């Protein structure tokens, strides 16, 4: 039986014809039976694809033949094509939607004016040298940080990357502008952009972790400064860096430690992802996001003895 894997990758490089790159990438992925999501813009490419390991290796080889992608780094993760519903290859104004396509500048070396890149070991060395002066700044959506983050990290109150500019311009973080700020995200791409946006807004000493949380976790597992699970945007929904991880998330109903996000049972107008322990998710009466309307719907199902997950 063939072994399957997931690839995570990105490259910031000027692309004069994103549409041509889109057509080439779609044809390449289809020929290798890969599924996943790829975004392309004039700034570069951002992708996550899964499939048989030999097909993934062939994809890496072919993709690196393109001049702008010849130095692109690929991160391997557990999973495969089945973790994605289909193959999606799209052209967008941005490969990460911060809402600042005209502010971001890239050249053949990547993002212009971004934060200083630190290897995982250098992150630890910075903390050892500067202590509590160092601030970890989460570059992900606030929901992702519920199940894992760097120790004592600042977690901005954002639902999407589009919210970051208003958040950092709000004045909430002005006290960090003279401190060493280490931005981090899943694989590094969001912080390539976020760090440059922060520098443009007066943050004087900004860093980013090479390869993001994934690279840091691969090197240090659960023995470093990372705590908990890593949220991922596929069917797995979370991954860990070894079996000795700590569950830092808590069920919204009973406060039991959990790293499992579940959808609210109100399928018509909610379906919000919230943290629920197995027991509370199994109980129809508590399988909701705690909004009043959703709680009422759950109570109605429970009273009628109906479980929406049980098919006849």
Swiss-Prot record:
Disulfide bonds: none annotated. Keywords: Oxidoreductase, tRNA processing. It is an enzyme of class 1 (oxidoreductase). The keyword Cell inner membrane does not apply. SUPFAM superfamilies: Rhodanese/Cell cycle control phosphatase. The keyword tRNA processing applies. The active site is at residue 185. GO terms for biological process: tRNA modification. It catalyses: uridine(34) in tRNA + AH2 + O2 = 5-hydroxyuridine(34) in tRNA + A + H2O. Residues 130-225 form the Rhodanese domain. Pfam families: Rhodanese, Rhodanese_C, UPF0176_N. Its EC number is 1.14.-.-. InterPro entries: Rhodanese-like_dom, Rhodanese-like_dom_sf, Rhodanese_C, TrhO, TRHO_N. One of its GO terms (molecular function) is oxidoreductase activity, acting on paired donors, with incorporation or reduction of molecular oxygen. It comes from the Bacteria. Belongs to the TrhO family. Catalyzes oxygen-dependent 5-hydroxyuridine (ho5U) modification at position 34 in tRNAs. This is tRNA uridine(34) hydroxylase.
């Amino acid at each position: 039986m063939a072994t399957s894997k997931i690839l995570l990758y990105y490259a910031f490089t000027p692309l004069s014809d994103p549409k041509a790159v889109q057509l080439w990438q779609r044809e390449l992925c289809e020929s290798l039976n890969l599924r996943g999501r790829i975004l392309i813009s004039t700034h570069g490419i951002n992708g996550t694809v899964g499939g048989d390991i030999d097909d993934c290796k062939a994809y890496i080889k072919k993709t690196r033949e393109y001049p702008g992608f010849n130095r692109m780094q690929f991160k391997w993760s557990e999973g495969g094509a089945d973790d994605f519903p289909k193959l999606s290859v799209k052209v967008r104004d941005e490969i990460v939607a911060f809402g600042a396509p005209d502010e971001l500048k890239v050249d053949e070396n990547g993002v212009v004016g971004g934060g200083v890149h630190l290897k995982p070991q250098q992150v630890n060395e910075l903390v050892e040298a500067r202590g509590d002066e160092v601030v970890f700044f989460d570059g992900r959506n606030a929901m992702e940080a519920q199940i894992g983050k760097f120790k004592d990290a600042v977690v901005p109150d954002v639902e999407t990357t589009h919210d970051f500019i208003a958040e950092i311009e709000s004045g909430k973080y002005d006290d960090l502008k003279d401190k060493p700020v280490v931005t981090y995200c899943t694989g590094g791409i969001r912080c390539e952009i976020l760090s440059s946006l922060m520098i443009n807004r007066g943050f004087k000493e900004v860093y980013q972790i090479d390869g993001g949380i994934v690279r840091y976790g691969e090197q240090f597992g659960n023995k470093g400064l990372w705590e908990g699970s890593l949220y991922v945007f596929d069917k797995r929904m979370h991954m860990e860096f070894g079996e000795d991880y700590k569950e830092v998330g808590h069920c919204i109903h009973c406060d039991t430690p959990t790293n499992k996000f579940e959808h609210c049972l109100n399928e018509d107008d909610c379906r919000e992802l919230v943290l629920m322990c197995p027991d509370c998710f199994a109980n129809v009466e508590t399988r909701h996001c705690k909004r009043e309307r959703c709680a009422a719907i759950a109570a109605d199902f429970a009273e009628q003895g109906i479980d929406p997950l049980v098919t006849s």
